[in-house]
Amino acid sequence: MHHYTENHVFCENENIAVVFHPAHNEEIHIHDFVELVYIAGGRGHQYIDGKKYSVMRGDMLFINLNHTHAFTTDKGMEYYNIYLKPGFISSELINADNAMQMLTLTAFEDFRETVGEESPVVRFSGGEMAEVESCLSAMLREYEHKENGTGTVLQSYLMILLTYVFRKMAAFGGVQPGENGNKIGDLIQYIEENCTQKLSLTELSEQCFYNPSYF
């Protein structure tokens, strides 16, 4: 099984990488960074930790680090990849307003139980899909041109994109506990066990993105 490291996708001093892929298959692999996948055209199948998902245009999946991932294409599937360094998420993207939403985004297994086992994390359609694709297209152009301030612009676009994701998650009522528990429950337990200490957002986010016991 291939292991993608940060050096495979990030240039020096980059925290976000954006790539558009034409149709091709990818064997099972893992990576030590966070990945957002958006299906921009066609159809295919994504496999995350051995579970198969039929995907089509408008679908977005969240793949945390150290999860196994593979996919096959059908009918010319095209897709965007957004790669994020975990340390960047915990230090730059999480703030007091979006902390719980960002942390619940890591609970992929629990959220898919809410929307159905065959569903991806979120599915956009109509005007929502057009807005998401416009945002992704702008991110790709910005990343490829790499002008002054590209990092700031990409972070701004990413927050817009994640806001669309949060809205879609909220439409399903958020993450619900599954039969096997969930990362949010574990996170709450961690907070309770350390309630006498001052906990930072970085420390809390690391419970989802870094601690191997949370995968």
Task: Place the predicted regions along the sequence by residue.
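An amphipathic alpha-helical interaction segment
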Residues: G116-V175
